């Protein structure tokens, strides 16, 4: 399978050839601006995907555990204005890892429980700050959904 992609854009010409001799190896050739820059690597398609995802990861994320109270700054676009809206609550679940890592944050708003799922590496998440550490003995805190008032509080942890 041979894929050739040629693109010319403002004095920049890029030629990309990917030759797949077997299912697991690929050859990558790149030429830029008259200089020949050739990079040949033998990467499987899954390794190419992992490399792309590694570039998309955010570098500065705090350690977040289930039970922690966090403040998430969410980018909101209203018309042509963009602002950051804080959302504070208890982390009741963590899922996956890598680029698709998510947390579920629960808070009480006007007497009603509201849960939001945030992708940690999404560009919509502007900031993430741990307000206090929680001491829990479960991986998922879905039982907090059934509790009301002071029963929804999580004990504070001081050793992390």
From Swiss-Prot:
Coiled coil ranges: none
Pfam assignment, any one: Ribosomal_L19
GO CC field: cytosolic large ribosomal subunit
GO BP term, pick one: translation
Cited SUPFAM superfamilies: Translation proteins SH3-like domain
GO terms of molecular function: structural constituent of ribosome
Annotated keywords: Ribonucleoprotein, Ribosomal protein
Function: This protein is located at the 30S-50S ribosomal subunit interface and may play a role in the structure and function of the aminoacyl-tRNA binding site.
NCBIfam families cross-referenced by the UniProt entry: rplS_bact (TIGR01024)
UniProt record similarity statement: Belongs to the bacterial ribosomal protein bL19 family.
Entry protein name: Large ribosomal subunit protein bL19
Gene field: rplS
């Amino acid at each position: 399978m041979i894929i050739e992609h040629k693109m010319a854009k403002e004095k920049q010409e890029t030629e990309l050839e990917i030759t797949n001799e077997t299912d697991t190896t690929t050859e990558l050739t790149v030429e830029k601006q008259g200089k020949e820059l050739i990079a040949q690597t033998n990467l499987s398609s899954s390794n190419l995907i992992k490399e792309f995802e590694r570039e998309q990861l955010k570098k500065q994320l705090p350690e977040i555990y289930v039970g922690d109270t966090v403040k998430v700054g969410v980018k909101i676009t209203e018309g042509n204005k963009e602002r950051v809206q804080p959302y504070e609550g208890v982390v009741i679940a963590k899922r996956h890892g890598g680029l698709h890592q998510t947390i579920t944050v629960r808070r009480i708003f006007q007497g009603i429980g509201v849960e939001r799922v945030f992708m940690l590496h999404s560009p919509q998440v502007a900031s993430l700050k741990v307000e206090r550490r929680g001491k829990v003995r479960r991986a998922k805190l879905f039982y907090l959904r059934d509790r009301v008032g002071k029963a929804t509080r999580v004990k504070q942890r001081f050793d992390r």
